[in-house]
Amino acid sequence: MIRVLFVCHGNICRSPMAEFLFRDYVKKQGAEAEFEIASAATSTEEIGNPVHRGTRRILEELGISCAGKHARQMRKQDYEYYDYLIGMDQWNISNIMRIIRKDPEGKVFKFLDFSEHPRDIADPWYTCLLYTSICG
């Protein structure tokens, strides 16, 4: 089984969006049994809160439910459990490293490092650049 943890600052916008989109993709590929997919925050600010209404709205428009998801903070033990820890921006990567201390197995990646155009995914909470419906 491949275990993937998506990580952002608060675990209410970007990382749950990535978690549920990837879950949907894996399910549509018939590979659900091969993956465990979750998300977490590097901060404590939103712990226990549900996915942000703007993120929920976008996922619902795509026919994807994130019901029952509440923000949780990443723990040092997550490094041992997950095969991939994927942050949304360089700040997330720095905070992941602060939590886990070191990455001897090369498990930490930035999300868009897997794309042809590696870059940060801006935090919509502060920038409104990723999906403007969150800021409305």
Where in the sequence are the language-model features?
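Conserved small/polar residues in nucleotide/adenosyl-binding loops
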Residues: 131-136
